[in-house]
């Protein structure tokens, strides 16, 4: 890691935990993310003030279920799983609250790098980002004049389509897809609610 830093590296990520490497990085103010898959390794990382660790290989050491179990006693720790993460399970990983980030070799295959196929790599990265954010329409918002009208609209939709009615404080829902506000709002034309796997990541876009 000393050679990497001498060559300009601003952070170090290691597949496993090395006390020597972690101590040197902390002492020299170099960001370090060590691989930790056991309580002992996580506690060692925490003793140096670290809050993010790598979990590798994730598919071998239990994946999400293992990290979820570890996040119980180590609630302040976030994981970066690599190994077994791909475009098929990316959304499941990234939406877990104890996941800081993920890594996957499918984004930058050695063959694509060697062939300078950067357009393909860029496309894969964009698709991964889209999957990670997981934008979907959550519901459509409709404005009603008052609480009585709001409930009447929801009941009409339920009668027509069997959506079901859920009454709330400031609005009522017809199923999960239509929200009818009880009073007028500044957004006079209603609203469209979009959900995401991660609000902080979405806000950074």
Short names for language-model regions:
Residues 4, 25, 53, 93, ...:
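Conserved, mostly hydrophobic/aromatic
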Residues 141-183, 201-202:
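Core segments of cupin and vicinal oxygen chelate
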Residues 185-205:
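Mid-chain, well-packed structural core segment of small domains
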Residues 1-7, 40-49, 65, 71, ...:
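Catalytic cores of alpha/beta
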Residues 25-30, 111-133:
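C-terminal helical cap(s) of enzyme catalytic domains, especially alpha/beta-barrels
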Residues 16-21, 54-64, 98-121:
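Glycine-rich phosphate-binding active-site loops on the catalytic face of alpha/beta enzymes
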Residues 1-2, 8-18, 31-42, 51-59, ...:
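Catalytic beta/alpha-barrel core
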Residues 129-154, 187-194:
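N-terminal beta-strand motif that seeds the catalytic metal site of vicinal oxygen chelate
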């Amino acid at each position: 890691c000393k050679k990497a830093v001498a060559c300009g590296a601003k952070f170090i990520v290691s597949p496993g935990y090395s006390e020597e490497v972690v101590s040197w990085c902390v002492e020299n103010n170099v960001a370090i993310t060590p691989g930790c898959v056991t309580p002992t390794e996580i506690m060692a990382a925490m003793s140096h003030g670290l809050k993010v660790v790598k979990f590798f290989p994730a598919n071998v050491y239990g994946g999400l279920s293992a990290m979820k179990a570890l996040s119980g006693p180590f609630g302040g720790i976030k994981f970066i799983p690599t190994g077994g993460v791909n475009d098929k399970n990316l959304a499941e990983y990234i939406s877990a609250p104890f996941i800081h980030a993920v890594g996957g070799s499918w984004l930058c295959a050695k063959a694509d790098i060697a062939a300078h196929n950067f357009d393909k790599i860029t496309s894969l990265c964009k698709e991964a980002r889209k999957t990670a954010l997981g934008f979907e329409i959550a519901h459509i918002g409709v404005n009603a004049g008052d609480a009585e009208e709001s409930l009447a609209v929801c009941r009409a939709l339920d009668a027509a389509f069997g959506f079901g009615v859920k009454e709330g404080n400031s609005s009522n829902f017809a199923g999960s897809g239509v929200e009818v506000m009880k009073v007028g709002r500044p957004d006079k034309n209603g609203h469209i609610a979009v959900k995401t796997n991660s609000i902080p990541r979405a806000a950074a876009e």
